[in-house]
Regions:
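Internal gly/pro-rich beta-alpha loop/helix module
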Residues: 1-95
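Residue-level signal for short, function-critical loop segments
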Residues: 8, 107-110, 211
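Short acidic, glycine/serine/threonine-rich loops at helix termini
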Residues: 13-19, 41-47, 116-118, 158, ...
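Hydrophobic residues at beta-strand termini and immediately following loops
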Residues: 33, 132, 208, 246
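C-terminal and late-domain segments of enzyme folds
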Residues: 70, 97-99, 111-123, 128, ...
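Phosphate-binding active sites in nucleotide-utilizing proteins
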Residues: 99-164, 168-175
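Cysteine-nucleophile active-site neighborhood
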Residues: 153-233
């Protein structure tokens, strides 16, 4: 164990107290960074504000300057030199595969929550990824399937609802049998309508027979499981899926069964 870098320290006394505790434990302190509001990333109801909506230049510069002054960089570099090599066994190698399908990925200010591993897995399986914007583009790109990830569509409901040509393109693609996978905010976009925090309701794509409404408090959090009732692109009947919920919205089916 090489040591620690203290952060969010509020005062000289705070730093002295923590350093004393670390000394008693025999833990080297490589640096001590003071609390500074300029270093913080702005937050929203689901967590951090997406980088597409902010300019992090000032915060990064503040962090850089603080590290230069408050961290023993020479000791940190020497510590890095003494580190043992990490074992690479078990790491999967990615080999080039023939591109077998063109997959559209919704990516803009409203939809940006994607695990890089998910996109890499698609490419490793032979997908050619094509990014598009449900906010700005008039229609889907020339693709074989579409992936709508999460994001903050509730912050852009007016623009999403006004882009009727994109909605028409998605509905037409669905009618022609194109596979469409939507999760989180993407699923909200696929419903009939979404009501924002102020109670305003906006028509959406309408492929999912349900409506969504934003709430002021957290509605769902935790792990869930699902059982396939019909065969689909994710599995066969009775297959089980595991997932995670973290929602400030509620969904109400408009048809039964859902």
């Amino acid at each position: 164990f090489g040591g620690v870098i203290l952060n969010r320290l509020g005062s000289d006394n705070h730093e002295h107290m923590i350093r004393s505790a670390m000394k008693k434990l025999g833990i080297p302190v490589l640096g001590a960074i003071r609390r500074d509001e300029r270093m913080q990333s702005p937050e929203r109801h689901l967590g951090l504000t997406p980088v597409t909506e902010i300019d992090p230049t000032e915060a990064i510069a503040t962090i850089r300057d603080a590290v230069k002054v408050m961290v023993n960089l020479d000791a940190l570099v020497e510590l890095g030199k003494s580190a043992v090599d990490l074992p690479a066994e078990g790491m999967e190698s990615v080999t080039a595969v023939e591109k077998r399908a063109r997959i559209g990925i919704a990516m803009d200010e409203a939809f940006s929550f994607y695990y890089p591993a998910s996109l890499a897995a698609l490419e490793a399986a032979g997908a050619e990824l094509h990014y598009f914007s449900p906010l700005q583009d008039a229609a889907l790109p020339d693709v074989d399937g579409v992936f709508f990830g999460g994001g903050f569509p509730e912050m852009f409901l007016s623009q999403l609802s006004a882009n009727t040509s994109m909605q028409d393109s998605i509905r037409q693609a669905s009618e022609q049998g194109m596979p469409i996978y939507a999760e989180c905010g993407g699923l909200m976009y696929m419903t009939e309508a979404v009501t924002d925090f102020e109670g305003h309701t906006y028509p959406m794509v309408g492929l999912v027979p349900a409506t969504c409404e934003m709430q002021q408090t957290l509605q769902r959090v935790g792990y869930v499981s699902a059982t396939m009732l019909e065969p689909n692109i994710l599995g066969s009947v009775k297959d089980h899926l595991r997932g995670h919920e973290f929602h400030f919205s509620t969904m109400t089916p408009t048809q039964s069964p859902f």
